[in-house]
Amino acid sequence: MCEAMDFLREVIGDKLILGCGVPLGPAFGKVDYCRIGPDVGLNWDGSPKERLLHRERVSTKNTIGNTIYRRQLNGRAFWNDPDVYLLRDDNIRLSAKQKEMLAQVNGLFGGLLFTSDDVGTYDEEKRALQQSLSALREAPRSVERKGKYTIVRYQGQDGEKELRVKL
């Protein structure tokens, strides 16, 4: 895989490469952006059957975990692509809090911010959240593990904020 990534970089030259599905090690220094976890799901953690059969699966919960725990790669090995954030209300089974957490974690630790939503349908609150995400990249932050929770603290526009994520 390392030789394939070397070849790809040689052929592509200075064009931007977004690696998706590539093992992380061979992508170091070869791609500009790289997906760092699974696809975001339309619900929190898939069905019970999916959880029993597959560790690597579409899962918003797993996406958030990968984004937090692979944050050190961002800007060092490549820029992190944590997958899309979703704020929409239709065709989704994430709570408002889960959608906001996904967007904030992507803003804090992602090198790319993508959504597959029709942003033209966002209400004022969703537009404000979307517009605040890029500023999070520069926010001082810390991450610690306490029991079943991962706690992310960061400096928001109106003081210190805390995300408590049960992974």
Write out the residue ranges for each language-model feature.
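Glycan-recognition surfaces
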Residues: 3-121
